[in-house]
């Protein structure tokens, strides 16, 4: 009941300066602000070069939400700029979640947000951070690729949010599908 009407904004795969340019970023920030979300969740693949990390997160920091901003890294973010992204997110008061959980509390109730570290490295990250959680809690799993949800047990997860597929489920500023999940069109 405490979270009745709770609004989540979710963005992923911005690929800033490749798919998303400066005008598009400013439009996105305005759109996010207008949504008046309670929390902003981000699914990774933020940039196309380390020099774009600071301006990207500086712009996203203009989106103020009562319960904060959380993000996981995408495959591009592990390939380059990982530490820059983590440090810049923290600098702007955002919380990177790499196989970690955090709890949103309101009037004695809670929502748990669990974030997955590099979902492509199942040897190191093949145990979901949700397994240790209580099935009584409402848990949001934040992961870069939806394939992780099929490849690994994500017990105790009530809602999973992922990006990566660029599958056109939601087109932002006319960007068309580019990469599909190996599970096809199963994910929306």
Regions found by a protein language model. Name each.
Residues 3-97:
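Membrane-embedded segments
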Residues 15, 46-47, 76-77, 101-102, ...:
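Catalytic metal-binding/acid-base residues of hydrolase active sites
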Residues 27, 54, 98-99, 123-128, ...:
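N-terminal post-signal-peptidase region of extra-cytosolic proteins
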Residues 61, 146-188:
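Conserved beta-sheet core of the metallophosphoesterase superfamily
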Residues 87-94, 98, 106-143, 149-151, ...:
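Binuclear metal-dependent hydrolase catalytic cores centered on His/Asp/Glu-rich metal-binding motifs
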């Amino acid at each position: 009941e405490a979270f009745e009407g709770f609004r989540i904004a979710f963005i992923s795969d911005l690929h800033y300066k490749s798919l998303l340019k400066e005008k598009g970023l400013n439009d996105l920030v305005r759109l996010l602000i207008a949504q008046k979300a309670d929390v902003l969740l981000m699914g990774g693949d933020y940039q196309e070069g380390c020099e774009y990390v600071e301006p990207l997160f500086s712009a996203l920091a203009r989106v103020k939400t009562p319960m904060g901003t959380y993000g996981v890294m995408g495959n591009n973010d592990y390939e380059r700029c990982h530490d820059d992204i983590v440090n810049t997110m923290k600098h702007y008061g955002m919380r990177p979640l790499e196989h970690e959980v955090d709890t949103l509390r309101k009037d004695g109730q809670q929502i748990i947000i669990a974030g997955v570290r590099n979902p492509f490295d199942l040897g190191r990250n093949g145990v979901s951070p949700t397994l240790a959680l209580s099935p009584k809690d409402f848990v949001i799993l934040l992961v870069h690729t939806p394939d992780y949800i099929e490849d690994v047990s994500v017990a105790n997860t009530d809602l999973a949010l992922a990006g990566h597929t660029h599958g056109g489920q939601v087109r932002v500023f006319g960007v068309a599908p580019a990469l599909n999940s190996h599970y096809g069109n199963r994910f929306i």
